[in-house]
Amino acid sequence: MTLRDIRQEEFANLYINSNRKNILNLCPRFGKIRTSIKIFEKIKPRTILIAYPDKKIEESWKDDFKELNFDSSIVTFVSHISLKKHTDKNYDIIIIDEIHLLSEAQIEICKEIFKNNNQILGLTGTLSKWTEKTLNKELDLFVIAEYSIEKAIEEGVIVDYEIRVIKVPLDNKLPQTFRNKVRSEKKQFDALSYVIDKLEKEEKNTMFLRLNRMRVIQNSIAKLNKTKELLKEFKEERVLVFCGVTKIADRLEIPSFHSKSSEKDLFHQFAIGKGNHMAVVKL
C-alpha cells in the first residue's frame, strides 16, 4: 500500500466517522474520486448521485469506476446545471464534485436537495476561505479534511514543480460590454472590487461578486495578448495552456481542447507528441 493509498483511506474514514455532511478539500492529482470510492465500499450505498461541473469530470469518475471494478449501475450522474431535476429525489449519498464552482442558483437548489438526503460529500481541491465560509453558511457543510499541494509534495505523493508568476496589468483602454455597462476590463474589475470591499465591511456575502470578478480575469484581453506573446517566445517548445474559459482557449490561435471541441482526439494526439502548443479548459 502506497502513502497515497494510506492518506485516501484516512480521509475516507474521517468522512465516515463524521456526521456525513461535509467537504473534503484535497489537492489536485491526489485522488478525490478514489477516496470517494473507498467511502462507497465501506458504507455500501444502494443509490448514489454525483454532480459534476463538466463532462470531463464525469468521464474521470467512469474511468476510475471501471479501473477499480466498482458497480456504477447504482450511480446517477448529473451536471451542476441540471441539479434542479433532483430536488424531490432521495439517494443514499450525494457527491457534489468541484463544489466550489456552484453558482448562487445552484446553491439554492442544493438547499432543497439536502432537505431530503442525509449523506452529503462535497469535493474540492481549490477552495478559497470566502467560498468555504459561504458553503458553511448557506449549506451547513464544513471542511473536515485538508490536504494541500505543499503537504502532498513534502510526502512525495505528487511530483514537485516550479511556478513562475508573470503579472499582467488589466487592459484599461479597450471598451467591453459587461451586462449593461461599457467599460474597460480594468474599470470593471475596480468597480466590482469597490462593491466587494464595501460589503465586506458590512459583513455581507461577497462570494458571487468575487466569482464575477474572477470571470473578468479569466476573460482578460490583456492576459490573452500576453499569452500569445509567450507562445511566440516558446514557439519551438512544447506548451500546454490551461484556460479558465473556452472563449479564450479558442482565441489563442493554437489547437484547443475542451467540452465543446468537435475533434475529441486532439488532446490524445498532442499527448503522444503531435504539435507544440495546445490550449485546454478544465482538463
Put a short name on every predicted segment:
Residues 59-63, 238-242, 247-283:
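Conserved helicase ATPase core of P-loop NTP-dependent helicases/translocases
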Residues 51-90:
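Inter-Walker segment of RecA-like/P-loop motor cores
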Residues 20-23, 145, 149-238, 243-244:
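Interdomain linker/hinge connecting the two RecA-like lobes of the SF2 helicase core
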Residues 101-162:
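Post-DEXD/H (motif II) to motif III coupling segment of the RecA-like Helicase ATP-binding lobe
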Residues 1-24:
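Conserved pre-motif I regulatory segment
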Residues 27-28, 53, 244:
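P-loop (Walker A) phosphate-binding loop of NTP-binding proteins
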Residues 19-39:
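Walker A/P-loop
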Residues 74-112, 281-283:
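Conserved RecA-like ASCE ATPase "motif II neighborhood" in helicase/translocase motors
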